[in-house]
Amino acid sequence: MSLTYYYAPQSTASVTTLVLEELGIPCERVKLDIRKGETKKPEFLKINPNGCVPTIVDEGVAIWESVAITMYLGEKFGEKAKLWPAAGPKRGEAMKWLVWTHVTLGEAVYRWARNTMWAPEDQRNANAAATATKDIGKLLRLLDDALRERPFLTGEYTLADAHVNSFVDWLRHMKIDMDGLELLGAWSKRCSERPAYARAMERENG
């Protein structure tokens, strides 16, 4: 078994857990306890000097950052499984949504979280939080509109849908307002009804 997956349940690794379930590929799973500092131990820092999950090691090469992992697994395993577009514009579209989620939407979410729950109360900026909330709403409407004429982000379900929906799930858990985003809600429901999603949730909660 050449693929090793380092993860922690209920963390930023959740999306990779879902991607692996969708692909159904065998791997060695190494569970790390973030609260106990296991991601900061020297033996793990040799694999990922950032000290964070998710991280995979395939054929002796360490790959970190969830977007990079999804793209890599998609290219290596996903095309054959019909979960990743062949090289061409559709693959570019899938990659676009992955990067948009973590860069454009992610930046607004970071500003919101920084000023609502991550920073000490005396270091939070209510105006910045309000602006971030508006920006998140605008971006989610953009995503909703992109689903107006197609059931999934590139037309057919791919790992991009799994990945982006995992992020949307987290926003919903954080009580981000999604009222009125009916297309987004229906898309998320379709993604969440897949068997791989149920298996991933079992791993997350097990």
Identify what each model region corresponds to.
Residues M1-N127, D144:
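GST-like domain detector, emphasizing the conserved glutathione-binding G-site
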Residues I34-R35, G185, N205:
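Conserved beta-strand edge residues that scaffold enzyme active sites
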Residues G74, F167-V168, M201:
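Active-site-flanking alpha-helical
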Residues L98-E193:
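GST-like fold's C-terminal all-alpha helical module
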